Regions:
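Short, solvent-exposed amphipathic alpha-helical segments in soluble enzyme
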Residues: 37, 138-139
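A glycine-rich beta-to-alpha transition motif near the start of alpha/beta enzyme domains, typified by
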Residues: 1-117
Length: 139
């Protein structure tokens, strides 16, 4: 017997993720395993992965991102834009400037709602990593 999981699926410029609102629902006990099951495009909801939207001590929200294989990643620019839309649409933060905590640090964001299902979101991603040797890779 399975466990019910409340989620929403959103996409930002082609990146599609399953989002779990941990403000309103308990965090999954095994997020990596849940990400693998939900992101499976043949037997699950399908997506690039799963993002937990959690309360934060230092920002309006915290995002934890899991790839489709269950590995945890620092962040995704399109994913964080959807997190920003979700927290404003659900009333956890006001539209306008806000911050979101990610595995890469706290990002400055501006949310401009364009209706109940859309927002224009600007994200300051910080300086780009241009050299391959500087890109974090786990072996």
């Amino acid at each position: 017997m399975g466990t019910d999981v409340a989620f929403v699926k959103m996409h930002g410029l082609g990146n599609d993720y399953v989002y779990i609102d941990v403000f309103a629902n308990p965090a999954p006990e095994d997020p990596a395993g849940l990400a693998r099951r939900l992101a499976d495009r043949h037997r699950g909801v399908g997506g690039d992965g799963m993002i937990l939207v959690e309360p934060s001590q230092v920002a309006a929200a915290r995002m934890r991102m899991f790839n489709a294989d269950g590995s945890e990643s620092e962040m995704c620019g399109n994913g964080v834009r959807c997190v920003a839309h979700l927290i404003v649409a659900r009333g956890y933060a006001a539209a306008g400037p806000l911050t979101i905590e990610t595995g890469r640090g706290v990002l400055a964001i501006e949310v401009m709602p364009r209706g109940p299902l859309q927002s224009q979101v600007k994200v300051d991603m910080g300086p780009p990593i241009l050299l391959a040797r500087d890109v974090p890779v786990e072996h």
